Amino acid sequence: MRRQRKETNYWMSYADLMSAMLMVFALLLTIVILDYREDMVEKQKQIDAVTNVKNDIIAALTEEFKGSNLNIEVDAQTGAIRFPGNILYDTGSSEVSKEGKKFLSTFVPKYFSIILQDKFKDEISSIIVEGHTDKDGPYIYNLNLSQSRAFSVVEVIYSEGFKEFPYKELSKNYLTSNGRSFMVPINNEDGSYNAEKSRRVEFLFRLKEEERIEEIQKLVTEE
């Protein structure tokens, strides 16, 4: 009888221990889940803040250039300003034409007045003039052409003959140029390649927090 009582006490003690361990585990799991949720909420707030700024800039650019006769396109997703290369250059040339300079003298002041206004300028990391070509010719030739064309736009903007405009000096802290050869083509709605639209120049902007937010978005998606 005494042995049976001892065994009963033993199993009761073991059961109590297991119950206590399960309670501790459940408590720790709850804490981890709550911390995870708070972390996700904070990350989402950061993503939303950057997304809101980007959307505000895109909306302002769209409003500024809608209905204009400049023949430009505002990408609703990225905010990239896109216009055909033949507006600025003659075929095969990287030198900005007379008509191209006239176009830039109208476009550039309007663009910088949006991008570098007080409520946006502290959020901007860089502004990139980016050149693109079609697939005609070898990669290196087109890379050189696209880079030269993008650089020539920046060169014209800061040349002595270019008209003064607000934010001109400030823009030097942001503006750079880049060429992508034929690596980022434009396709038609049916997915077919559009050589004419692929020959283009784009004005892009990057936000200071954008790269970090992209990393956060990857983590959120993976988790």
Give residue spans per PLM region.
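Short, cationic low-complexity segments
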Residues: 218-223
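Extracytoplasmic/secreted envelope proteins and their assembly/folding machinery
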Residues: 54, 58, 62, 101, ...
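Short terminal targeting/anchoring segments
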Residues: 1-63, 67, 76
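Periplasmic peptidoglycan-binding/anchoring modules of Gram-negative envelope and division proteins
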Residues: 81, 93-128, 158, 162, ...
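Short beta-strand elements
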Residues: 64-75, 119-125, 171
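Periplasmic OmpA-like peptidoglycan-binding domain that tethers envelope proteins to the cell wall
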Residues: 98, 130-210
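Soluble periplasmic/extracytoplasmic beta-strand elements of cell-envelope proteins
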Residues: 71-73, 80-88, 126-130, 176-178, ...
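Second-shell loop/turn segments in exported
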Residues: 47, 87-101, 138-144
